[in-house]
Structures are given as C-alpha cells and as structure tokens.
C-alpha cells in the first residue's frame, strides 16, 4: 500500500501522484486520508483509478462529491478494487454505490465482500432457458413474452410509463416469485426510489429485495458504478444457486454517466457525443447479467430513449443484448391506452411456436396482422372516411380497434390515481380473449367495452351495462 498526493482536481476527476514504483492499478480503489486540517471534503472519500498517466500520476474518479478537495491532500491506495457487501445481510436494505447503508438501519452485518469488477461467466457455464415467465400484463404476455433467466428492455421516451410498467412487473413478478430481487436505481429520481421502498414495505416483500441507489443528484462516478454494485450482489445470490430478479432503472443514465466521465478524462467523443467505449462499457455490464448452470438472473431494464429516437447510439447498443424488447409509444399513450406498449414494435425471441405453442403463436400473429392492416388503412380513413372501405376492411378496422382497447389494462400500482383496481390476467385468459376477438365472436359488442378491463369476460359484462 502506498500513499500519494492530489496534484489536480477537475470536478469529479482527480489526478494523484504516487511514488513511481508504487502506482496503483487500473480500477483500484483509493481513499482520502484524514488530516487534522479543517476541510469540508467528505471523510474517507473513495476514488477509482481510471488511467495511469505516467510519472507516478494516476487519473481517478471520485465516488462522491469532490467539494472541498484541494491539491496536496493525501490519498491512500487500498491495492484492490471497490468491494461491496453481498449475501443475505443485504436483503431489505438500501445501499449506495460503495455498499454503505443509507436507510438509517445500522451497519450491514456481513463479512462477505465482493469486488464490483468481475469477469463475465465463460461460454460453457451459460445456461439458455425457454421457460416462460408470466407477467399478468396482457400485451406483454401475448406479443413479447419473457423467458425465465432472460433479459428484457423497456424502451420509451420521457413520460410514457417506463417506471410505472417496471413497478407493475415488480408487483406481479417479485411478489409471486418466491426468489430474491435486486433493484439498482441508476441516475433516476430519488422520489421514485422512495416510492419503490415504501411499496415493497407495504406489501411485505422488503426482506426479499436488496436495493442500491445512485440517483440523479449524485456525481457521475456513483451513477457509472452503481449498476455494477447491484449486479455484483445479484451475481453472489446467483452463484449460491438461487433464481434472481434484477431490475435496473435506468440503463441510459449508466451510459450518460460514462459519457460525462469520458469527456472529463479527455477522450475524444464519438457519434452524438457519446464515449468512444460505449459498446464495450455496455457489453461489460450486459455480459455479466446472465444465467449460469448454478442459478438464473432474469433482468428487467428500463431504457430511456432520447427524443423518442430508437436509432440513438445508446438505446441501439442496448438492443443487441436483449431477449425481449418492450417498446412504449407516445402515440399509443396519447390515445389514453395504458400500458402504452406498441404491439408492432415490441419483439421477443420467445415468440416461437416451439416455445410458446402453436395456439399462442397464431393468436399473437393474428393480432399483429389485424393491427398492421388498420395502420395501413388509417391514411385512407383520414382522407375519405370509413364509408369508402370495403366490407372486409371495415370489419378488420372494427376488430383492430377492439384489440387496441383490449390491450389496455388497469395496473395495481396505478390504482391510486386511476381509481380502478389493478388486474392480473393469466396467459390462458389472454390468449382466449384475443382469439375470440380475432375470430369474430365478439363483433356485435361496442369497442368501449374492451377498454381498461382485465379478462374478456369482464369486457362482455361491461358491454351489457353500456
């Protein structure tokens, strides 16, 4: 272990000079040595080495506010990467990027710690799975089903409901699921983290969830590493042979923190100002989120889409790593249909007759074909009106509008502001309902009957009252 001194501070990026023969390695953790002088710098502030500049100088990034730092302050090398507590003691607790508790419930009682930088599992250790994970959300179960041990991305612009969808998935899966969950809040609003904590507490599943937060107000170092902290805790449970749910809100902020750090480290930006190492950073994180022969990790990640542009480098790089993509659309949200999932844009590798079965596959494809036909006819309807359509097209449009409304569903987590109780719809019911609409059994019912209901029987009941 060696000590060095700060020679330059540029925001969260700090240059520290060590003796030439005792330079710390890349990703080693450094800590600020407490001196007797008065300073308002955070006590024991941690840094992570990012670059070795030469001549004993390393460039590090502060894992906390760099206020109060100045040249000449002493810094100690720990000789190992940042490590965080793992294991059962983390359950029910809220931690920061360094694994320190931030819930005022005392220290975390575990000796077991693990470095946040780990290699991804080897190719022969991976275990693909084809078991479906039922979510109880009609549109997801029908057109973009999730796999146990798979990776799911929720893509959407600002304010179309990524976090609400994620909370509903947590509500439906984590509460039904007997295993453990890890939630990583990466650069999101503190209020959402707070809501999540209380939601878990009220439903008595808090002792099955470990929470790690590095929110919007934190320096970029925290936001860049907090996803790895959460992932390390999830990996530790997986390696014990458990089935884990890993939630990340929001992957885009992880990329954004990387962009901030990259610019401060003096790297040349690449497309749209992102860091040149974007694909590698994303790969390092995503390749570790995987199921092995010992245990599974099912991950659900919210991905913010800047300016609703799915071709932006950040969401585009994320797409490559996912099994299912749930795309939330502003146009559908504008119609008042929630969850605002676009059934034509969302995809899943699981939607294959050999995995979901022939009936499910055919119903899903019928639904998509009907909606696609309606999409093509919209321009004609806008110019000439419905009367100019052929009888077959009129029928297709009327069915498509019923399908569109039947894809909406009241959420448990939105009960507070919608006033209608949430519905969990089993997969069999979902398939039966859409099959009835597509086959024409319900052509006589008004389309309003299908809006914001659970199963098809509720729609039929609602039609009687209209």
UniProtKB/Swiss-Prot annotation:
- The answer to whether UniProt assigns keyword ATP-binding to this entry is yes
How it assembles, according to the record, is:
F-type ATPases have 2 components, CF(1) - the catalytic core - and CF(0) - the membrane proton channel. CF(1) has five subunits: alpha(3), beta(3), gamma(1), delta(1), epsilon(1). CF(0) has three main subunits: a(1), b(2) and c(9-12). The alpha and beta chains form an alternating ring which encloses part of the gamma chain. CF(1) is attached to CF(0) by a central stalk formed by the gamma and epsilon chains, while a peripheral stalk is formed by the delta and b chains.
Annotated protein name in UniProt: ATP synthase subunit beta
List the InterPro entries hit by this protein, alphabetically: AAA+_ATPase, ATP-synt_VA_C, ATP_synth_F1_bsu, ATPase_a/bsu_AS, ATPase_alpha/beta_chains, ATPase_F1/V1/A1_a/bsu_N, ATPase_F1/V1/A1_a/bsu_N_sf, ATPase_F1/V1/A1_a/bsu_nucl-bd
Entry's transmembrane regions: none
* Physiological role: Produces ATP from ADP in the presence of a proton gradient across the membrane. The catalytic sites are hosted primarily by the beta subunits.
**Any one GO CC term of the record:** plasma membrane
Q: Which Pfam families match?
A: ATP-synt_ab, ATP-synt_ab_N, ATP-synt_VA_C
């Amino acid at each position: 272990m060696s000590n060095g001194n700060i020679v330059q501070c540029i925001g969260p990026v700090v240059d520290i000079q060590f003796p030439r023969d005792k330079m710390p390695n890349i990703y080693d953790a450094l800590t600020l040595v407490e001196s007797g002088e008065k300073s308002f710098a955070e006590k024991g502030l941690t840094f992570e080495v990012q670059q070795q500049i030469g001549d004993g100088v390393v460039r590090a990034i502060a894992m906390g506010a760099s206020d109060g730092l100045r040249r000449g302050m002493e810094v100690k090398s720990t000789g190992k990467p940042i490590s965080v507590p793992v294991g059962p003691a983390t359950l029910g607790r809220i931690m920061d990027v360094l694994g320190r508790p931030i819930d005022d419930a005392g220290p975390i009682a575990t000796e077991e710690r693990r470095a946040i930088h780990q290699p991804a599992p080897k190719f022969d250790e991976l275990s693909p799975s084809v078991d479906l994970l039922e979510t109880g959300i009609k549109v997801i179960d029908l057109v973009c089903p999730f796999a146990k041990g798979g990776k799911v991305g929720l893509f959407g612009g600002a304010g179309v409901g990524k976090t609400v969808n994620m909370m509903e998935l947590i509500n439906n899966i984590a509460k039904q699921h007997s295993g453990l969950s890890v939630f990583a809040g990466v650069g999101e609003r503190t209020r959402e983290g707070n809501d999540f904590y209380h939601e878990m507490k009220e439903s008595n599943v808090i002792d099955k969830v470990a929470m790690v937060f590095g929110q919007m107000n934190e320096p970029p170092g925290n936001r860049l590493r907090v996803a790895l902290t959460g992932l390390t805790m999830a990996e530790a449970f997986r390696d014990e042979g458990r089935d884990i749910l890993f939630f990340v809100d929001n992957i885009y902020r992880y990329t954004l923190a990387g962009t901030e750090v990259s610019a401060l480290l003096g790297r040349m930006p690449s497309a749209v100002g992102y860091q040149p190492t974007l694909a590698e950073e994303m790969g390092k994180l995503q390749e570790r989120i995987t199921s092995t022969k010992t245990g599974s990790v099912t991950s659900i990640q919210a991905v913010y889409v800047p300016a609703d542009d799915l071709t932006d480098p950040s969401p585009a790089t994320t797409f490559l790593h996912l099994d299912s993509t749930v795309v939330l659309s502003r146009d559908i949200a504008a119609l008042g249909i929630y969850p605002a999932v676009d059934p034509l844009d969302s995809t899943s590798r699981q939607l294959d007759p050999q995995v979901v079965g022939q009936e499910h596959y055919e119903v899903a494809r019928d639904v998509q074909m009907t909606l696609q036909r309606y999409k093509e006819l919209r321009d004609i309807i806008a110019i000439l009106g419905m009367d100019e359509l052929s009888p077959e097209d009129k029928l297709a449009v009327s069915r498509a509008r019923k399908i569109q409304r039947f894809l909406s569903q009241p959420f448990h987590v939105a009960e507070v502001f919608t006033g209608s109780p949430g519905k969990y719809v089993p997969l069999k019911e979902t398939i039966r309902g859409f099959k009835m609409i597509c086959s024409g059994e319900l052509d006589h019912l008004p389309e309003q009957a299908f809006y914001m209901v659970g199963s098809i029987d509720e729609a039929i009941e609602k039609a009687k009252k209209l």
